[in-house]
Every structure is written in C-alpha cells, then in structure tokens.
Swiss-Prot record:
The gene is fusA1. Residues 8-290 form the tr-type G domain. Keywords: Cytoplasm, Elongation factor, GTP-binding, Nucleotide-binding, Protein biosynthesis. This is Elongation factor G 1. PROSITE patterns: G_TR_1 (PS00301), G_TR_2 (PS51722).
Amino acid sequence: MARKTPIERYRNIGISAHIDAGKTTTTERILFYTGVNHKIGEVHDGAATMDWMEQEQERGITITSAATTAFWRGMAGNFPEHRINIIDTPGHVDFTIEVERSMRVLDGACMVYCAVGGVQPQSETVWRQANKYGVPRLAFVNKMDRTGANFFKVYEQLRTRLRANPVPIVIPIGAEDTFTGVIDLVKMKAIIWDEASQGTKFEYADIPAELQASAEEWREKLVEAAAESSEELMNKYLETGTLEEAEINAAIRQRTIAGEIHPMLCGTAFKNKGVQRMLDAVIEYLPSPIDIPPVDGTDDDGNEVQRRADDSEKFSALAFKLMSDPFVGQLTFVRVYSGVLKSGDTVYNPIKGKKERIGRILQMHANNREEIKEVLAGDIAAVVGLKDVTTGETLCDIDAHVTLERMEFPEPVISQAVEPKSKADQEKMGLALSRLAQEDPSFRVRSDEESGQTIISGMGELHLEILVDRMKREFGVEANVGKPQVAYRETIRKTCDEVEGKFVKQSGGRGQYGHVVLKVEPLAPGGGYEFVDAIKGGVVPREYIPAVDKGIQETLPAGILAGYPVVDVKVTLFFGSYHDVDSNENAFKMAGSMAFKEGMRKASPVLLEPMMAVEVETPEDYAGGVMGDLSSRRGMVQGMDDMVGGGKIIKAEVPLAEMFGYATNLRSLTQGRATYTMEFKHYSEAPKNVADEVIAARGK
C-alpha cells in the first residue's frame, strides 16, 4: 500500500510540561484545529479527549501518554498535508517514567510553560530527559491571558535555569486581559485570531505602532540566529542586513534539529490563541523521521547495527507502552523505526527470544480508534494480542534480528503492603497486579516471605494510590493498603580481606563439602554487585564457581542488619578446598552464602536511605516557615530562586522517610498556597539513630 503521506511530512512529537501549565488543554486545541475534535474538550469539566482514564478526568491530571494521530495543512492552508503523531506526556513527577519512555520514541517535542509560573521544577526534569535522548524541541508559553503573565521573563528563565537557547518566532501583543494576539517575527505581521470561530479563522494585520521598535529588535535576534547556520547566510546578512523568509525558516529548522536553538512561541490555549501558529512551527522546524540519525541497535552477536526510517528496510520497532483496554484487551504501543508491520505478521522479540503474532493494528485518536492493515516506517500505532512483550522491548523481522537500545527504568523508592478485602479477590488481585506491573516497569510486586503479605513498590505515594485505584476500577478488586514503607538498602563501608565459609556434613554415606575464602569490599554508589573469580590452581573446581556466585546472590535480597537488599558490593573468590566425593554445587552455594554473611558483619555494614530532591513553590511570606519545616525533616536546603509571577522556589534534599504526609503539612503551613514536587535523587547512609530505629522495628 502506497503511503498517503510521504515520510518527510511525518512529525512524531511529544507535548510535555509541568503540571498545570495547561498541556492537556493545549493538546485538545491541537486536536480541535486539526479537525479531529469538533467540540473542544475542557479539562475544567473533566471531558478532555486525551485524558481517557477515569482517574485522570477526576483528578484533572494526565497520567498515561495516549498517542494520537492528527493532520495539519497550516493555519492558512499553505502546507501540503502533514501527519502529526502526538504523544501526551504526564507532568506529575511520580510519572516521570511515562515521560522518559515517550521521549525515547519521539523525534521532536513541544515544551509547554505557564506564562505566570515559568520554568517550574518538573520542567527541569523533563528538559533533562529530552537532553538525554537528544530530542529537538520548541517552547510554547501558555496562559498569556492570566494575571502576572510575562513572556520575556520566561524567556530569561529558559536561558538561565535550563541553559536553553530560546529564539522567539513570535512575541505577544499585550498580556493578561489585554493579550490579543502575536506578532509573527518571520513575516513581521500581527496575527489576530477570530474569537467567534474559536480561533479557526485569523487575519494578518499591521504591527501596532507602540510595538514596532520591540518587534524590530526581536526580529533582528531571529535573523541573526538564522544567519549563524552557515557562513554563506552570515555573509549575505552582513552585506544586505536581512534574509528572505524561506532562508530564515530553513536555517531555523536546521539549527533546531541540530539542538542548537529552541524556537519559542506563545498564546493562550484556553482562549484559542497561539496554538495554531505553534502547530505551523512544528511543521516548519521539528524533524521528520528521516531528518534524524538512524536508530542504533545490536545484532545477535552483539555487533552494532543501524536501521534507517525506510519501508524497504527490514522491520524493527520498539514497544514503548502497554495498556489494558476494556474493549480489546492488552494494547501495545509501538514506534516502527524501519520496514513495515502488517496485521497477521509473525515477528521476533530478541529480549525474550520468542516469536509473536501480530493481531489487529489500531491507530489511536485519544480514546477513539481506527483499525488499519499496516504501519509504515516512522509511524506509531497500537497492536492487539501480543502475548509476552514488556515496555522497552524490541520487535523485529524473524530473519534479521536486532535489539534496539533498552530503556532505563528507575528503582522504586516506596512500598506498601496490599491485602484483598475478601477471599474472592485474592486470585483477581494477583492477576491485576501482574498486568499493572507489565504495563509500568517502575511498579514492582513481590511477596514478603516472612509475613506472606503482597508488597507493591513504586515511585511515590500518588503513583501507588493511582495503581490501587486502577485495580478497583479496571479489575474490580477491593484492597486494603498498609502504611507506606521506605525502600531502605544495606551496604558495607570497609573491606574484609579474608572471610571463610565452610559447609560440611559428613556422617556416613554421601556427605556435603564446600569450602570457600572470599574478599568482600564496597563499591561506589550505583555499583550494584560484582563477583570476581580469582581461583588459581583449581583449589575450587571450575564447575562449582557459579554455585558460589549464586549462593551470594541469593543472600543479597535480605541483608544482615534489617533484611533489606544489599547493594554496591564486590566479592572476590580467591581460595577454598573441595572433597572428591562429598563436594557438590549445593555445598558450595551454602559455603558462599555463609562466607558472604560473615564478611558483611566484619565490613562495617550500614543502612542506606533514599534521599529525595524536593522543590517547593511558595508565596514569599511563607518561605521562612517552609525552610524551617524542611530542616526539621532532616532536610538540607540547597537554594532558593525567584518565580516569574512572584514567590519563591525552595530546593532541598530530604530523606523520603521524613516526607510522608508532607502534602497535608505544607497545605496547613501555607494556607494551601504552596505546591511541591519530589523525585528520587540517590541513596545515602542513614544517621545512626535513624538506622537503630529501623533495625529495631524490623526485629520485632
């Protein structure tokens, strides 16, 4: 089947922002102007098209990134039809994983900022993730109609806080309730949208006289940014003092795709102004799948290979999101990097080493769906009926294996026990939890051997709350939830040069004999676990060495202090002995485990606790109280910044154990006027009094 839209007219973009910057409303307007939605869905009344889970509509926040396809010909109908796949990403910090996994499959992003709030804490997290995956992006300053809106202050913050290089393509006409439109610096015309048509019609007008000087100054900056793209353009600019419209657009496009600059636009999505011009900028400046480098992967032998965005290449795709759908069951969202995927095809999952048959293929429009026969290179779609595919895995051609880069997922920092309310719910709960864990790699489920309880772990209180809520709504499972528990870790501080483990049972008949000598030493934070085989002269036979490693690894999940997982240790096996008849794998496994436990005791074991990066936005009057409160929670205040619309941002590092119930506390401290975000930073050694309490509580 020939392409309806050539690949150079595809745009895979993410819309990403801090909570409350108006991202979902912006996406709604995009869907409206691209002719998909005929009545605009408002977040205010819980009817936004992109936010399709019940909890999202109730809470007014976006949790899952729905992928939607839309078409655009330019606000003046001046482009050939372009196909835009939009991935809506959540702005709440507990859902950073969603942002991370969508960044992996995007070609470009539109970052939405609030004209009053400016660059907020989550904006910085999202910006870092976009840097990590090298995503070209543009900035849209929303809510220009709000009191305190200031486009130029946000411009400064993008430069200072994010170290971005913003280049305004438009500047606002007025602000707050006098915001009437924008000045297009490329055309040097004012754009005024027609309110009666909800902004679908507009007209170009002359620049208001009082803004002429400002417009010329910003136009100069735009043309300079364009001229810097090549020596040829720079020479022309120096000779003539100006550049053609087509030259400016081509140069800004080139520099945006290279990540050197970030085009900046503004408007108010709620009042139907500015999103239309931003959509034009998506087409003019953001890359198509063929404007970015081919995707890297490895073949079965570990050699590096590349896949180009071309239908004639062998098929490869990345599964970037799983969702349970009430009508069709499990949906797997895939980004096709090369080749073509047809329904009925059999493909290969190299991570699991299994074949998968492709059932129906759906193109999603928020919560509507259209069945299609095939997905071409560069496109995004949802596949029904995959049996065993997890987020971040590759699907590829059966005869041309490739593993695309794995995504990295963070370790959970908070745990809770869950119990079904009735016997009947027991089995259903197991099924529900495993389905949810498959969809969300930052959510883990395990069974506590001692208490027999089911423990769920995630990225924050809200994260777990929403998953328990989904269990009830989607699977009909009622559960009681225990108090949140901190995910502590254990490690060592000193090196134990020699520790012995001997497992001997010899009382007639076939006995057991395993004897090892280990060196146990600490690794740098994040080092995990390392096992070194330094046996010389066969004192421990080759075939038993993996058993020693296995014995140690089986000890790692429960440390000697309080039974928490052990991290950042290196173990070297350098001596031991064996018995011709009585030695076996099990004996060496036991010996390894015994020696390691003893080694930990001798190597100054310590308890590690998760430290969180906490950022609080508060009116200035309450800043002192907020800082005092954070200090009383063993927090280290690391700095304070000014917000665009007044107020302060306080940055601190606080142990997670001290942050439970913080939302309620902050509300009463600031009369509900402050907000905060929190994300995991690193593990750090818990003070002795804290460690003693935790160990005593676990020992009960």
